[in-house]
Amino acid sequence: MDKLTWYGHGAMGLELGGHQVLVDPFLGGNPAASITPDKVPANFILISHGHGDHVGDAIAIAKRTRATIISNFEIANWCQAQGAPTTHAQHLGGGFKHPFGYVKLTLALHGSALPDGSYGGNPCGF
């Protein structure tokens, strides 16, 4: 059975067809989070934009779980440069059939600078 778990702020976990999908995994330092970055399961991590409270613990979680990070081109490249083992870049309006389901990036109106100040590309919804 598919399941959604809200971890506070924009962070959530989805169990879809046996795959663990994290969205905007801001867990460490998030007082609402019911799980820590070293315990959360993940096969895929979706990042909507570059702000630290959405990129959150994505790199550490991806390194620990070998999860694929899915985001826009700029964020996917930044994550790879930070040591994420696998990324999948998509562009706004484009979609891709992942093992857990189809993901299409939609436009979001928001900032997207990454934690180190570099350009995070266009923010997106999924």
Feature map (PLM): residue ranges:
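Catalytic phosphate/metal-binding cores of nucleic-acid and nucleotide-processing enzymes, i.e., regions
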Residues: F44-L46, T68-I70, Q82, T87, ...
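Short, polar loop motifs at secondary-structure junctions
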Residues: G8-H9, S71-N77, H91-G93
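Catalytic core of the metallo-beta-lactamase
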Residues: Y7, M12-L16, K97-F126
